[in-house]
Structures are given as structure tokens and as C-alpha cells.
């Protein structure tokens, strides 16, 4: 691992500690930092390029085979997306945003995490229903108190 990547990984860990209010964050087996946003499984990843970058990505829906109808739907979603990229890869609908380490701070990382997680959560159930897939996590049902109605 390059010195630049080690520095960036340390910086990302510190930002995630601040975001999640914990004293230590733990990377998964791939070296990414997982989190959940509704029905979406999300990760923060430090990319080991010549110039390291940070990618925030999510699985919105899984088990969805590629089709012309799916790609047309994803194109429509992508055209409305402001700060996230939506694409299909290996039977999964992915949402991601890549960040430069220059100027990376708590605010910019939080924006990326909320944008990616929010889009993935917003589109996951719809796409899973339309294309016979599933979301990484089940939808959280809100219990309705019948006496309150």
C-alpha cells in the first residue's frame, strides 16, 4: 500500500469516526467500510490508484439480469440524478460517487454517503419489484398504532 493510500485511509477512518460517533471503524474483508441506508447496502472505499481516490457505493437491488428495459429505466434514473451515478453490473444495480482526496472533509464525505445511500434506497424497491430482484436489506415496516388512527 502506498504512503498516499495509507494517509488517505487514515483520514477517511477519522472522518467516519466523526460521522458515526464511534472511536474506531472496522473495514470489511475487502478493506471497505460498510454502512446501511434503508434497504441499500453501502460502502466507503479507498481506491488504490496512482492518485488514490475515495468511492462511496451502494447496492440498490440485486439478482436483476441485464435487459434492454432495465437499462432504459436506469438511463432515465441517471438523467435525473444530481450527484450520483447509477449503473448495472453483475446482476446488481449500483449507485456510486467518487471523491478526490483534495478537500475531502466531513461535509463532503457526508454528502456523498447521504446522496449514494439515499438514491440507492429510493430506487431499490422499485427496481427489485419491476425486474424480479431483491434489495440487500428488507424494507423497515413502520408499525401503525390502530388506536392513534
Regions of interest found by a model, annotated:
Residues 2, 6, 64, 68, ...:
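Ordered, soluble secondary-structure elements with a strong preference for glycine-centered loop motifs
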Residues 9-23, 50-68:
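Charged, low-complexity, helix/coiled-coil-prone segments
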Residues 34, 87-99, 136-142:
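A short beta-strand-loop-alpha-helix capping motif that often carries His-Thr
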Residues 53-98:
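Short, internal acidic amphipathic alpha-helical interface segments
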Residues 73-82, 101-131:
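Ampiphathic alpha-helical segments that act as solvent-exposed interaction surfaces
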Residues 35-38, 42-58:
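Short, well-structured hydrophobic secondary-structure segments
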Residues 127-149:
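Short, highly charged C-terminal tails/helix-capping segments
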Residues 1-41, 85-88, 138, 149:
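Charge-rich, low-complexity N-terminal segments
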Amino acid at each position: 500500500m502506498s504512503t498516499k493510500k495509507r494517509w488517505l485511509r487514515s483520514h477517511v477512518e477519522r472522518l467516519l469516526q466523526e460521522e458515526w460517533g464511534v472511536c474506531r471503524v472496522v473495514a470489511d474483508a475487502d478493506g471497505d467500510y460498510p454502512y446501511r441506508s434503508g434497504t441499500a447496502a453501502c460502502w466507503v472505499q479507498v481506491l488504490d490508484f496512482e492518485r488514490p481516490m475515495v468511492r462511496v457505493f451502494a447496492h440498490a437491488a440485486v439478482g436483476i439480469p441485464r435487459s434492454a428495459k432495465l437499462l432504459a429505466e436506469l438511463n432515465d434514473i441517471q438523467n435525473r440524478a444530481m450527484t450520483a451515478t447509477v449503473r448495472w453490473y453483475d446482476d446488481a444495480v449500483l449507485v456510486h460517487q467518487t471523491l478526490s482526496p483534495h478537500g475531502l472533509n466531513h461535509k463532503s464525505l457526508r454528502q456523498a454517503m447521504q446522496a449514494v445511500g439515499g438514491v440507492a434506497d429510493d430506487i431499490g424497491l422499485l427496481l427489485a419489484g419491476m425486474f424480479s430482484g431483491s434489495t440487500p436489506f428488507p424494507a423497515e415496516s413502520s408499525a401503525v398504532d390502530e388506536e392513534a388512527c
